[in-house]
Amino acid sequence: LGLADRYRLNQRRERWAASARRLWEPGLVSGVLALVYLLTDPSSADLAAQTFRVGLFEHQGLAAWDNLWFGGHHLPGYGFILPLLGSLVSPRLVASVAVVISALLFAEIVYARWGERARIGVVWFAASASISLFTGRLTFAIGVALALGAVLALQRGRRGVAIGLALLCPLGSPVAALFLACAGLTYAAWGKRREGLEIAVASAGMVALVSLVFPEGGSEPFVLSSFLPAFVMAIVAFVCIPKQERLLRFGVIAYGLLLLFAFTIDSPMGGNATRLGALFLGPLFACALWQRQRMILFLLAPLAVYWQVAPVVRDLETVQAQPSVHASYYAPVVDYLRGVTTKREYRVEVLPEAHHWESAYMPRGIYIARGWQRQLDRKLNPLFYESELGPGQYRKWLDSLAVGYVAVPDAPLDYAGVPEANLIASHPGYLKPVMRNANWTVYAVENPTPLASGAAELVKIKPQGFILRGLRRGKATVRVRWTRYWTVERGQACLVPTQDGFTRVRVLKPGPIEVHAGFTPWRVLGGGRICSHRDLSSDG
């Protein structure tokens, strides 16, 4: 090697050595905490939803639709990446690796900006990102890793990589993608207008596209007691961060506006908006203030740490020593319900527990009327979030979803299950107890509404479709929610949505009718009518 080559090689080695010295601390902190998470294996509430979705992918593959929850709903809006990777290894392991990657990416970003001043913030972020695993927000962990990768690529001038990661981020976590869009707008306001807007448009645009193609909607609650502390922290951050830290100050402004938007306008984001501040504000405080205003940092740090730790403690307390987080708790009632619903298929209403593991363990051959996605539950089942729940209103809801059985656990309930439990305890005449053990009481609904009525009867409901037997020409109502992706794979029939969002089948010829939901691009903007053959589409 020549002298110039040796010099360049030595410089490269020195950079690698310096990078290794900087990264070992966040790598160690996040790695140890991730290992503790994997060993302790806490059954937090959000993990129940991830477990269900990974199980669906293992059995159904990449699906657009699921009938096991809510009478039918679209799947991809909640994230593609975790079900895919989690089915190959383990969802917990995938998220743990993502957290370590996030800690290393954050370190690279802030060391490049603040140098050694960032050390405390780097270690802080590694710890806070890792403890968020204990809340079960696994999709969010993947989304944060992709978002930080996009920010690092943007910082290093690799626009193509940044845009690619911004497009991937919503497939990991829509919430993290909207946070990335917020970061992109911050960069644009700071001066990197084109690069920042590219990131913002890519991430937010992909969220909008997924929402358009696989609509779900609904709103996440954002109560005043959650909004005020977050908004006050944003104001305090803006006041305390030195004026020369323009990028950081622009970011705090963007975050404050995001909080206002999420609080004043009903949206799926809702209270999830606080996650960005809880995860990043404290570590960024430390980076910006450590060598300039340590006293302010020492005053604010306890508040920021409490903001990060309190949700983790609350979630762990919910599942602590609860037998109802284990599959064995559900086995007797699942066996009973499988037996009775095999004879004639109905949905089962399972009162939602505080930790929501019923949504993972009950839908094993059983189609439940609700599930664990707060936004969708509020949209489809608003009666459980209103002040009073009357017996007539409840009976109407049971009939709308063709519920034949109601299962009541002895475990602590979610707040959206308490009014329902109180009503059932008042013994409405249409509910008859048919099974009871130490943990469960199952009620049969008197004269339940069938899943299919009219000109066809139900043969079988499947996770992504249903099979009917057409009895005569005419209309049948199927109490499975409508999707534009229905396809008539067998038989002669046309499908249209009902006014209340379910599926109406017009039987054109008696006999077997098989309907399946599969993604087809030309149906994205489709509307009302789906027929088995083109030449039947004009049939009245």
Where are these regions (language model features)?
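Signature aromatic-anchored transmembrane alpha helix within multi-pass, membrane-resident enzymes
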Residues: 292-311
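Membrane-embedded helix bundles of polyisoprenyl
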Residues: 30, 100-109, 117-155, 159-188, ...
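Membrane-interface junctions at the ends of membrane-embedded or membrane-associated helices
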Residues: 2-18, 69, 154-162, 188-197, ...
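Extracytoplasmic
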Residues: 311-540
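Start-transfer (signal-anchor) and selected internal transmembrane alpha helices
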Residues: 1-35, 539-540
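Transmembrane catalytic cores of multi-pass membrane glycosyltransferases
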Residues: 41-49, 59-63, 143, 164-281, ...
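Active-site lumenal/periplasmic loops and adjacent helix-entry segments of GT-C-fold
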Residues: 34-115, 119, 124, 128-139, ...
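Transmembrane signal-anchor helices characteristic of membrane glycosylation enzymes that use polyprenol
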Residues: 19-47, 207-210, 306-309
